[in-house]
């Protein structure tokens, strides 16, 4: 009799617990599915950059040129930098530094990078991303979008690229 109790209890538990796939999908109907590479519209002017949606990265990073940190009014940290879009157009930005991030390098050691808030739109998903300014010249993608921006907004299809409809409705103008 004791031998029958264990299989019956196990069957009851399995019947009451939803399969993992079903549990994971709850609450995700309103999320946008995007490829792991998409066009990302950056800043108020909608500068278009080729970006990687990286679920393996916590934070976001953008290839910024001519980065110079300075004190505004002698106290607050500000940064001036340039971003270049896919079409070669360059836009200069000047804004406050939210914080500085220590980034671990693959070669060992760390580097200190300024972090800013940058409006972005990808596949119609808009938001303010916390982005560190980096020299990404040796990387294939000018902007990397990490989990902090993607969470609760985007599901990334790792087998697809450029599947987003252009729902950002921005034009590259000055």
What are these regions (language model features)?
Residues 1-10:
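Bacterial N-terminal signal peptides that target proteins for export
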Residues 18-20:
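N-terminal signal peptide c-region/cleavage motif recognized by signal peptidases
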Residues 22-174:
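Pepsin/retropepsin-fold aspartyl endopeptidases
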């Amino acid at each position: 009799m004791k031998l029958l109790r264990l299989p019956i209890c196990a069957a009851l538990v399995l019947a009451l617990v939803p399969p993992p796939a079903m549990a994971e999908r709850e609450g995700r109907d309103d999320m946008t599915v995007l490829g792991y590479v998409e066009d990302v519209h950056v800043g108020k002017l909608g500068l278009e950059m080729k970006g990687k949606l990286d679920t393996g990265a916590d934070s976001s990073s953008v290839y910024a040129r001519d980065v110079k940190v300075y004190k505004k009014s002698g106290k607050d940290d500000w940064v001036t930098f340039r971003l270049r879009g896919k079409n070669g157009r360059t836009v200069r930005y000047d804004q406050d530094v939210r914080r500085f991030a220590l980034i671990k390098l693959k070669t060992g050691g760390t580097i200190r990078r300024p972090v800013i808030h940058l409006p972005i739109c990808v596949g119609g998903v808009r938001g303010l991303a916390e982005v560190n300014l980096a020299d990404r010249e040796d990387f294939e993608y000018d902007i990397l979008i990490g989990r902090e921006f993607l969470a609760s907004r985007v599901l990334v299809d790792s087998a697809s690229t450029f599947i987003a409809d252009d729902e950002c409705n921005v034009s590259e103008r000055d």
